[in-house]
């Protein structure tokens, strides 16, 4: 996985896809700040995810953004997406690799270096840690810190993705402490004060 320091945003989809979503996504991608886009839809059927995924994949391809699927290796394979993100309750990376081959596989490690070491043994391509702040998207069960990033950097040179309540007021400290990508969702899609494009433009 290549790391582009100027494209440090790992954008996660809203849970509900509104009509305005696709035009908002294009505007965001035009800023050239996004390296990854993860499709995360919990309450849609496989068929619905497939239809939505095909549209998003085209947009991602046009802007050279890697298209990842949350949790579902079979949807990843069907869409021929660039990769899949796996949680701790999902299939492990080695088993996922048997299904989707040499695609990008990222693994949630919460705040645990022990889980990170296991993910590395299972050949994960990147490690995701969090939550670093309170989140509008998920209830915070695990609290990560800057020290989590520092410890992770000592055991691997794989990219580190940080997640959890990241916004324009708190993102810089994470980058200064060598997080490679900022996973953002609620700040963009649930922001009551700004449109998605204005929110992304606050992150320089």
Which residues fall in each region the model found?
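N-terminal amphipathic alpha-helix/helix-capping segment at the start of soluble metabolic enzymes
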Residues: 1-24
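Glycine/Thr-rich beta-alpha phosphate-binding loop at enzyme active sites
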Residues: 78-88, 107-156, 191-199
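Catalytic domains of carbohydrate-active enzymes, especially glycoside hydrolases
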Residues: 25-40, 122
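Alpha-helix-loop-beta-strand connector modules within alpha/beta enzyme cores
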Residues: 50-69, 95-112, 140-168, 201-204
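N-terminal active-site wall of soluble small-molecule enzyme domains
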Residues: 36-99
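Catalytic cores of alpha/beta
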Residues: 28, 67-82, 96, 111-124, ...
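Glycine-rich phosphate-binding active-site loops on the catalytic face of alpha/beta enzymes
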Residues: 11, 86-96, 128-140, 171-204
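Hydrophobic faces of well-ordered beta-strands that scaffold small-molecule active sites
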Residues: 7-13, 37-39, 67-69, 84-86, ...
